[in-house]
């Protein structure tokens, strides 16, 4: 199916929150003001995927440090000495699943020549998505960040080398 990927804009937030609501159980829903602050903190690394009916997927990311976890519902704190693109939240609306949109969103930020050019990428895999992320070269990685404890059981911190 045809879809486009573009930078996320403030006007997209209502649709982004609808996708979040469709993709996560209540304990994992993040507050609208936190989501909005994240876009303001890292506009260069937050993107949406759109189909003919509008926004149907998104990816929030920001420059961080390897080993650091963003707690659920916490604002982004971009690192001045970043070495890692932290992918905080990737979600695709049920209407658009299985059509390569998640792959396109990830490739948009991690594909060759993309900026910022950081040595690593990392994330917390939730909802049985570790195998999905493994397909992009991510593997379980040690972290002692206390933010991981706030995630549901089964969440896995994963990282990869970007090159
Ligand atoms: C995980 C998610 C983003 C995948 O979206 P999608 O648009 O259906 O994924 P794509 O169509 O781009 O699939 C890309 C590849 O991953 C595979 N894949 C998709 N979901 C998968 C999963 N849960 N486990 C393993 N592989 C998966 C696809 O088969 C495809 O493989 P292929 O290219 O070899 O055919 C989507 O299921 C989702 O939004 N889930 C709810 C939110 C969530 O839990 N996000 C993870 C946050 S860490």
Per-region residue spans from a language model:
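Helix-loop element at the rim of GNAT/NAT acetyltransferase active sites that forms part
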Residues: 7, 18-31
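C-terminal "cap" of GNAT-fold acetyltransferases
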Residues: 9, 79, 126-127, 136, ...
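Conserved acyl-donor/pantetheine-binding loop and adjacent beta-alpha core of acyl/acetyltransferases
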Residues: 58-91, 97, 144-154
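Conserved acetyl-CoA-binding loop-helix of GNAT-fold acetyltransferases
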Residues: 92, 98-111
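Conserved GNAT acetyl-CoA-binding A-motif
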Residues: 106, 111-126
């Amino acid at each position: 199916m045809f879809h486009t990927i573009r930078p996320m804009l403030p006007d997209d937030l209502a649709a982004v929150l609808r996708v979040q609501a469709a993709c996560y159980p209540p304990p994992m829903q993040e507050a609208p003001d936190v989501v909005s602050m994240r876009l303001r903190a890292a506009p260069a690394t937050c993107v949406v995927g759109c189909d003919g009916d509008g926004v149907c997927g998104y990816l929030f990311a920001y420059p961080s440090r390897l080993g650091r976890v963003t707690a659920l519902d916490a604002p982004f704190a971009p690192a001045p000495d970043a070495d890692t693109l932290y992918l905080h939240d990737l979600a695709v609306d049920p209407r658009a699943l299985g059509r390569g949109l998640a792959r396109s969103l990830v490739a948009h930020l991690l594909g060759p020549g993309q900026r910022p050019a950081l040595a690593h990428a990392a994330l917390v895999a939730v909802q049985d998505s570790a195998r999905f992320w493994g397909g992009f070269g991510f593997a379980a990685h040690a972290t002692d960040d206390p933010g991981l404890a706030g995630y549901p059981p089964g969440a896995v911190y994963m990282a990869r080398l970007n090159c």
